[in-house]
């Protein structure tokens, strides 16, 4: 017979493996280099604003089921002939739910004012749901095939404030 302590340890390990297999990270990572919506709105750092009801291609590179039918996705699409990525929260959202997109681009992040390199990444957001059922997107940015140029989507619900992030894409 397995004792309760080893069983709990086994279940915790299995839960962690399942979360990793699903491509989901639950909190506990290093913080971003910067965390202000103004770092990626209004054309800052090459990000572009677009409507909150925007959707990308049918294939979503990353998807997190937040619970209660609320979904956070990393969307991709095409804008003026270039592939782009952005984050989105949708479903029966509530005021205070949040979405943001992290961008890391080692070697691509130079050229700004001194001291503004993006290390370890730039957090684009958070953007906060204002009304029940509101879909909300982050600004978009062009993508690259360079493995040093990556995105992930993160979010939290007002009901529990647990931050969840997808794997990098």
What residues fall within each predicted segment?
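Post-signal peptide N-terminal regions of Sec-secreted extracellular proteins
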Residues: 34-169
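N-terminal prepro-regions of secreted/extracellular proteins
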Residues: 1-53
